[in-house]
Amino acid sequence: MENRLFFIFSVFTWQEIIRMSLVKAKKHLGQHFLTDKGIANKIVESLVGTDQYNQVLEVGPGMGILSDFLLQRKDFQTYLIDIDTESFHFLNEKYPQLGDRLINGDFLKLDFDAIFADQFAIIGNFPYNISSQILFKILDNRHKVVEMVGMFQKEVAQRCAAPSGSKEYGILSVFLQAYYKIEYLFTVKPGTFNPPPKVHSAVIRLTRNEVQTLDCDEKLFWRVVKAGFNQRRKTLRNAVSAVMPKDKMDNHIYFEKRAEQLTVADFVALTQHVSKLMEA
């Protein structure tokens, strides 16, 4: 098998290899294999690397087009995780040196503390059908995940990086921007994938900021933000009534605005105010 792989990778391009279906993209896993090495290298180069971590986890490596460039980096140690058993066996033959750093499993169920003793970074051409779940797992483990560079549907990437006041700004924008600096790096056309997705994709970078905990009740913050955007056309006086009775609200200016008009700092201040009103 090893000699066969050496022959294949020395003779054929990525596009030809994928067409030969060594690893078949599976619709139920949301797989769209990147075929452009130039873009793959650009994604890996977007991982800044800092003295805060020396380990990187790639999610959904497929046939290893990103992994090839990751393994050339000497500033960190690379781990791979793929839920697809076919990809796992392919990668196990391609990168025998990885050993137990190649994981056949579900990223969403992965216990980070069991694998990484210290902080680390995440990178990947992420399955589009679980994009939001991946981002919320990163949020839940923000004490561990220092940096993330990832490919998402363009619409999801825009929502992550959207500023307040824009139509893309929403729940995901606020939660991520509360703890991370978000950068929209570049757009990727459908033709660079096999099979090509129906929409454009985009690469974003998350860099954790200095905020460890918000200066408010974080559980209430999440409730207020969700309530605000679940009825984004209404003023917060109406939307936040899902969290607290209207008769407890005062004439604070935030109650007369819509959720999309508030920055993260505004939502923190609103949460503090709501908390005081609820306790009164």
Question: Where are the predicted features?
Answer:
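Catalytic cores of RNA-modifying enzymes
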Residues: 4-227, 265-272, 280
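C-terminal lobe and adjacent flexible extensions of AdoMet/dcAdoMet transferase-like proteins
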Residues: 208, 227-280
